[in-house]
């Protein structure tokens, strides 16, 4: 299999409410029952055609395309207020070029906002999923 036949796995840190919204999103898009258990964390890639990987690849594509608007909409203050132990690591799959593009955007957001990746991941995905970063 060539690189074009596989999606790259990468991790994002999310607050519990944003993770749950993402889990619901992937369930609705691809029927994935438990995103936390879906991808093998020890694997570096997933073959194309996998329904969960196809759904998260599309999500990453949308995040890259809409990043500027999501950045403007994101509630970084709420994401900053998340307890440091309140983040969940989850894995997504996407085309390697999309992974690289999204990582660059997240890195830029952390530099501009002078924050960490957990906060940027949570704020941007919360904006995309219309989720509240904090449990209230």
Model-derived features: where do they sit?
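Acidic, polar-rich N-terminal leader regions of halophilic archaeal proteins
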Residues: 1-136
């Amino acid at each position: 299999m060539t690189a074009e036949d596989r999606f790259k796995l990468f991790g994002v840190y999310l607050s519990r409410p944003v993770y749950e919204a993402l889990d619901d999103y992937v369930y609705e898009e691809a029927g994935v029952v438990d995103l936390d258990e879906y991808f093998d964390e020890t694997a570096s890639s997933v073959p194309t055609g996998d329904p969960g990987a196809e759904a998260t690849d599309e999500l990453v594509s949308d995040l890259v395309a809409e990043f500027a608007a999501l950045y403007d909409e994101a509630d970084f203050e709420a994401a900053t207020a998340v307890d440091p132990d309140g983040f969940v690591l989850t894995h997504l799959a996407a085309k390697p070029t999309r992974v690289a593009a999204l990582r660059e955007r997240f890195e830029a957001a952390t530099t501009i906002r002078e924050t960490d990746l957990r906060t940027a991941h949570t704020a941007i995905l919360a904006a995309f999923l219309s989720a509240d970063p904090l449990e209230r």
